[in-house]
């Protein structure tokens, strides 16, 4: 059975809540061999989007980045609705997970200890955030 995860992105989820019209979701599907994590990010009403990253940390606390999903670009791009897709492998892991197998990231996600953060030029600390949860 495939492992799937979902993340709902909202400004209210930031450690210091952000009042924004922006929103989004991120969906993840782990490959059957566990070596690749496919993702699909959809963001809405983001002005000057610069990057999207997975971080290690529980809800309500900031933690270190573990993988880039988009960017870092400068200047940022403004979009009404945008979709980014890609794959993460162990080679893409950074920070505390650099050099480790992808299974370490999956362990953090499964434990509720990973989140997606969306950054913009206007909210350099993060405009949207959401914990990554297993789809049951």
Residue positions per predicted region:
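Metal-centered catalytic cores of metalloenzymes
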Residues: 1-52, 56-136
């Amino acid at each position: 059975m495939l492992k799937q995860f979902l993340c709902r992105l909202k400004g209210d989820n930031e450690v210091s809540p952000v009042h924004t019209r922006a929103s989004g979701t991120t969906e993840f599907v782990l490959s059957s061999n566990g070596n690749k994590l496919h993702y699909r990010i959809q963001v809405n009403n983001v002005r000057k989007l610069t990057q999207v990253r997975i971080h290690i940390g529980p809800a309500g606390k900031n933690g270190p980045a573990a993988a880039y999903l988009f960017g870092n670009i400068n200047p940022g791009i403004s979009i009404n609705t945008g979709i980014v897709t890609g794959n993460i492998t162990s080679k893409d892991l950074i920070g505390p997970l650099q050099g480790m197998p992808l299974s370490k990231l999956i362990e953090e996600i499964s434990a509720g200890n990973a989140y997606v953060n969306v950054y913009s030029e206007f909210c350099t600390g993060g405009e949207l955030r959401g914990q990554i949860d297993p789809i049951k």
